[in-house]
Curated annotation (Swiss-Prot):
Belongs to the peptidase T1A family. The lineage of its organism: Eukaryota, Metazoa, Chordata, Craniata, Vertebrata. CDD domains: proteasome_alpha_type_4. It comes from the Eukaryota. One of its GO terms (biological process) is ubiquitin-dependent protein catabolic process. Detected in liver (at protein level). This is Proteasome subunit alpha type-4. The 26S proteasome consists of a 20S proteasome core and two 19S regulatory subunits. The 20S proteasome core is a barrel-shaped complex made of 28 subunits that are arranged in four stacked rings. The two outer rings are each formed by seven alpha subunits, and the two inner rings are formed by seven beta subunits. The proteolytic activity is exerted by three beta-subunits PSMB5, PSMB6 and PSMB7. Keywords: Acetylation, Cytoplasm, Nucleus, Phosphoprotein, Proteasome. Disulfide bonds: none annotated. GO terms for cellular component: cytosol; nucleoplasm; P-body; proteasome core complex; proteasome core complex, alpha-subunit complex. It is found in: Cytoplasm; Nucleus. The keyword Transcription regulation does not apply. The modification N6-acetyllysine is found at residues 127, 176. The gene is Psma4.
Length: 261
């Protein structure tokens, strides 16, 4: 039934659905996992890297996380070539605003500007929607630290913690369970991000080269965006594994004590 309505992006099906937009969202479901967590003292992005070739030059290559301006960064899930076009557009919008008003663009305004472009691609014929979902982290003087998510339809929302990409439903339920509102520090958010990625990524053992993590904090009145080095990620993974092993031991001891009773 749907085949008559999915050839053009602008045609509604009898149920009121735009199939091309839904197919674009489907593309994101197969992309590497990306998650964002908002903490009291900062905000972070963590992403799964799929392209981990030994000959890849790390200096020039960031697969999932991009800096947009001095106060914002984003992470992408979906078709990487589409993502490059959108991140370039985000940078241009931010620079134009800075040139015009002599101050950094508010986070939500930048997200809205890009979502207007994404939405236009669902309404005009002859073009397909962008097959990309983005997570944006940023800081501005109006609302402090912020985390946003947008999808191919041009829809966006502010989040405390969220996930896009492969196994995102499982990751979101874990975040819902473990996110402690008002108590999250960046340190505990990093530990939670590693825990979630460990559970949701389709690998038997989490390794540092498969993970990209960026943090956004404020230091002496300036926003600092840092992409964690591989050694730092290794330490986080090692710490998580030690805690898992400790919890497992305690669980076994408890079971043993109950048996002995």
């Amino acid at each position: 039934m749907s085949r008559r309505y999915d050839s053009r992006t602008t045609i509604f099906s009898p149920e009121g659905r735009l199939y091309q937009v839904e197919y674009a969202m489907e593309a994101i479901g197969h992309a590497g996992t990306c998650l964002g967590i908002l903490a009291n003292d900062g905000v972070l992005l963590a992403a799964e890297r799929r392209n981990i070739h030994k000959l890849l030059d790390e200096v020039f290559f960031s697969e999932k996380i991009y800096k947009l301006n001095e106060d914002m960064a984003c992470s992408v899930a979906g078709i990487t070539s589409d993502a490059n076009v959108l991140t370039n557009e985000l940078r241009l919008i931010a620079q134009r605003y800075l040139l015009q008003y002599q101050e950094p663009i508010p986070c939500e305004q930048l997200v809205t500007a890009l979502c207007d472009i994404k939405q236009a691609y669902t309404q005009f014929g002859g073009k397909r929607p962008f097959g990309v979902s983005l997570l944006y982290i940023g800081w501005d003087k109006h609302y402090g630290f912020q985390l946003y998510q947008s999808d191919p339809s041009g829809n966006y929302g502010g989040w405390k913690a969220t996930c896009i990409g492969n196994n995102s439903a499982a990751a979101v339920s874990m975040l819902k369970q473990d996110y402690k509102e008002g108590e999250m520090t960046l340190k505990s958010a990093l530990a939670l991000a590693v825990k979630v990625l460990n559970k949701t990524m389709d690998v038997s053992k989490l390794s540092a080269e498969k993970v990209e993590i960026a943090t956004l904090t404020r230091e002496s009145g300036k926003t600092v965006i840092r992409v964690l080095k591989q050694k730092e990620v290794e330490q986080l993974i090692k710490k998580h594994e030690e805690e898992e092993a400790k919890a497992e031991r305690e669980k076994k001891e408890k079971e043993q004590r109950e048996k002995d009773k």
